[in-house]
UniProtKB/Swiss-Prot annotation:
EC number(s) on file: 4.2.1.-
Protein name per Swiss-Prot or TrEMBL: Probable dehydratase YbiW
Role: Probably shows dehydratase activity.
High-level lineage: Bacteria, Pseudomonadati, Pseudomonadota, Gammaproteobacteria, Enterobacterales
Domain of life: Bacteria
Species this protein is from: Escherichia coli (strain K12)
PROSITE patterns in UniProt: GLY_RADICAL_1, GLY_RADICAL_2, PFL
Gene that this sequence comes from: ybiW
Family: Belongs to the glycyl radical enzyme (GRE) family.
Misc. comment: Contains a dehydratase motif that is predictive of enzyme function.
CC terms in the record's Gene Ontology section: cytosol
InterPro entries assigned: Form_AcTrfase_GR_CS, Gly_radical, GRE, PFL2/GDeHydtase_fam, PFL_dom
Length: 810
């Protein structure tokens, strides 16, 4: 078996990482807000695609750039290290309200200088009434506004933070280079017919792409000039040589395809960076990096031996730390659902390739190098995912487990055995299906061929919908009734449990439809107002169709719906079925009163204990609750299938919705807005995250958990089925324990057809001490949901949620 070298970092990488993890309150950068406002004001007469292209070009030409001491990969998102830019075209309302209090946020604070406050107070008023969020609310119906106000459906993220959730076509970029892409655009423009309406709009889009590609080239040339300027005054010969080499790299990749591993990695990082300057969206991912960078790695490291493996890993480390520098500021409410300020920049390794019609294991030496580099660095970025398949070698799986034992929540695993065949059933070409990658958290898409947002824009609070179904449509939190029904526990008029399920079906269909209506509005406003030009240029077939991603330019386009509180739904329904209708141990009105009182008083607390201990719980491989949950979830899936997204019929294959369970950390704020539930959960406490069991309810070990998760209708949940498991570090101390985990992984993916799994390897005692002494644990990384975060950067509520999760032994 290959033994990875997981305890080695170069001095420069150690210093760089240490400096980054000790930035507790990152600054805010206002340069982008200033530059975009200037160009929007100057070019109001221009079509929006051209206006946005000019704004990006102006910003890239005039923003502050820097090269840090000893870094090997260069490029910065903002004027200061880890500073978060402001994107006023999406929203200014929360910025104006919260700007003075950003430093006081628990776990996600930002430092704002008085000068930056002055700039924002100057810039923001111009945007009032014309941001994406403003225009969404101008289109929402009163009913939709009411639903959003209650929080049963939440869709703030994309109105205020943009789109994304995709990987662009990095292989095409490396093959053609930036000048080659410009040639492709020029050829397409030569076929434009300006007497055709679609082409008239297409010409403006293609013109915008050309403006942006020129701007990107010139921006890279700025770094070449800066590197030469720094080399001229550098006293250390070795660093001077590095700076000159970086200048030469930038000179080449500013126009031509890269020739070396260093150049290829640098070009990919520049594009990754500028994509996140262009758009405020997150989960901008790299796709299958071990595949498209391997030819360069093989030539330099294995064949020509012009680069040794250790130096290649150091370059990867430098790239990963540059990803950690990228930052994002969200509204106070949205930051609670994205605890730890994650960017979800996913790198996928492993899996299979389709070669002459036959699946072949895709693991190569770069797969091992990327895995090892992440295991050594133990950072939150990139979000490393491994594509599992039945033919994966024990050697590579063993290497993955070695990294899992490092305790930073990576790698996560996605399962080829279910993703690929289900993608092919959707209509995705087999060659493309075998080329899928993890996007953001657990979502999957085909890099460079899939439209924005493989994850949806609106979360549905399943627990609150369930409570409404039990109480005649009445939302216990807001007091509102959106869809009235006759039956209610408080009236004691449910005749049997089938009527409870009928009520659930009715309510979830209603809320699902409303979530899609809201998605439509947000999608439409993003399409009309924030064309992301560079991103579209790097997704097939946007150039050929002369359409942005949002207009239907991508080859494929599916969007997943999202929900929070899946396990709470199953556990609550199981408790009502068994204790109220089968045993008659609890009366309908008795349960309703206990829920309304949040189980206050001795009698209600005794009833709560019966709900907790006397009814089956999801996560223990118990069919009575697992199949009930699957049945309830299926109604949501069936309703979702009825709808098309706004790109349907406009070019892409697909244009539909499917389910997904990536709840990020929304289970904490959603729980805070949810009253007591029949599973015994108290009001305002966290809901279950993803498709994982509710904290403290999975008593029979990790094998029972995967048995329960495997009964979900996974094949229809193509947005991903998120499973977090927390293991005590003592569990993986010896070789036999490692073998047990490998067997567990193979069983989950091959027998139970699981979609995804990831592990926290950290003790409760360590987490409690880190909460008490944060300065001693600034580099402690934990798995939150489909992403990892620095534990001390989380809010106290999010920290408590992770501490409360069940800790398993193998």
């Amino acid at each position: 078996m290959t033994t990875l070298k997981l305890d080695t970092l170069s001095d420069r990488i150690k210093a760089h990482k240490n400096a980054l993890v000790h930035i507790v309150k990152p600054p805010v950068c206002t340069e982008r807000a200033q530059h975009y406002t200037e160009m929007y004001q100057q070019h109001l007469d221009k079509p929006i695609p051209v206006r946005r292209a000019l704004a990006l070009a102006h910003h890239l030409a005039n923003r502050t750039i820097w090269i840090k001491h000893d870094e090997l990969i260069i490029g910065n998102q903002a004027s200061e290290v880890r500073a978060a830019p402001i994107f006023p075209e999406y929203t200014v309302s929360w910025i104006e309200k919260e700007i003075d209090d950003l430093a006081d946020r628990p776990g996600a604070g930002f430092a704002v200088s008085e000068e930056n406050k002055r700039v924002l107070h100057e810039v923001c008023p111009w945007w009032r009434g014309q941001t994406v969020q403003d225009r969404c609310y101008g289109m929402f119906t009163d009913e939709q506004k009411g639903l959003l106000a209650t929080g049963i459906i939440k869709a703030e993220g994309n109105m205020t933070s943009g789109d994304a959730h995709l990987a662009v076509n990095f292989p095409l970029l490396l093959e053609k280079g930036l000048d080659g892409l410009r040639e492709e655009v020029a050829e397409r423009r030569s076929r434009i017919n300006l007497t055709v309406l679609e082409d008239l709009h297409g010409e403006q889009f293609l013109k915008a792409i050309d403006i942006v590609l020129v701007a990107v080239s010139e921006h890279i040339e700025r770094f070449a000039a800066l590197a030469r300027e720094m080399a001229a005054t550098e006293t250390r010969e070795s660093r001077r040589d590095e700076l000159l080499a970086m200048a030469e790299n930038c000179d080449l990749i500013a126009h031509q395809p890269p020739q070396t591993f260093w150049q290829a990695l640098q070009l990919c990082y520049f594009i990754q960076l500028i994509l996140q300057i262009e758009s405020n969206g997150h989960s901008v991912s790299f796709g299958r990096m071990d595949q498209y960078l391997y030819p360069y790695y093989r030539r330099d490291v294995e064949l020509n031996q012009t680069l040794d493996r250790e130096h290649a890993i150091e370059m990867l480390h430098s790239c990963w730390l540059k990803l950690l520098e990228v930052n994002k500021i969200r509204s106070g409410s949205h930051s609670k659902a994205s605890a730890g300020s994650p960017l979800y920049q996913n790198v996928t390794i492993g899996g299979q390739n389709l070669v002459d019609g036959q699946p072949m294991d895709a693991v190569n030496p770069l797969s091992y190098a990327i895995l090892e580099s992440c295991g050594r660095l133990r950072s939150t970025q990139p979000n490393l995912s491994v594509r599992y398949h039945a033919g994966m070698s024990n050697d590579f799986l063993d290497a993955c487990v070695q990294v899992i034992r490092c305790g930073f929540g990576m790698p996560a695993f996605n399962n080829d055995e279910i993703v690929i065949p289900e993608f092919i059933k959707l209509g995705i070409e087999p060659q493309d299906a075998y080329d899928y990658a993890a996007i953001g958290c657990i979502e999957t898409a085909v890099g460079g061929k899939w439209g924005y947002r493989c994850t949806g824009m609106s979360f549905i609070n399943f627990a609150r919908v369930m409570l409404a179904a039990l109480e005649g449509g009445h939302d216990a939190t807001s007091g509102k009734v959106f869809l009235p029904q006759e039956k209610a526990l408080s009236a004691g008029n449910f005749n049997n449990f089938d009527e409870v399920m009928d009520a659930w079906d009715t309510q979830i269909r209603y809320y699902t439809r409303k979530s899609i209506e809201i998605e439509y509005v947000v999608d439409t406003m993003l399409e009309e107002n924030v064309h992301d030009i560079l991103c579209s240029a790097l997704v097939d077939d946007c150039i050929e169709r002369a359409k942005s991603i949002k207009q239907g330019g991508a080859k494929y386009d599916w969007v997943s719906g999202l929900q929070v509180g899946i396990a709470n739904l199953g556990n609550s329904l199981a408790a009502v079925k068994k204790l109220v209708f089968e045993q008659g141990a609890i009366g309908q009105q008795q349960l309703a009163a206990a829920l309304a009182d949040d189980f206050d008083g001795l009698t209600h607390e005794q009833l709560r204990q019966r709900l907790i201990n006397g009814a089956p719980k999801y996560g223990n491989d118990d069919d009575t609750v697992d199949t009930l949950l699957a049945r309830a979830y299926q109604t949501y899936i069936d309703e979702l299938k009825q709808y098309h997204n706004p790109r349907y019929g406009r070019g892409p294959v697909g244009g539909n919705y499917y389910a997904g369970t990536s709840s990020i950390s929304a289970n904490v704020p959603f729980g805070a807005q949810t009253m007591a539930t029949p599973d015994g959960r108290k009001a305002h406490t966290p809901l279950a995250e993803g498709a994982s069991p509710a904290s403290g309810t999975d008593h029979l070990g990790p094998t029972a958990v995967i048995g329960s998760v495997g009964k979900l209708p996974t094949a229809a949940i193509l947005g991903g089925v998120l499973l977090n498991q927390k293991l005590n570090p003592a569990t993986l101390e010896n070789e036999s324990d490692k073998q047990k985990l490998m067997i567990l992984l193979r069983t989950f993916f091959e027998v139970h057809k699981g979609w995804h799994i990831q592990y926290n390897i950290v003790s409760r005692e360590t987490l409690l001490d880190a909460k008490k002494h944060p300065d001693q644990y600034r580099d402690l990384v934990v798995r939150v949901a489909g992403y990892s975060a620095f534990f001390t950067a989380l809010s106290p509520d999010a920290q408590d949620d992770i501490i409360a999760r069940t800790e398993h032994m193998l």
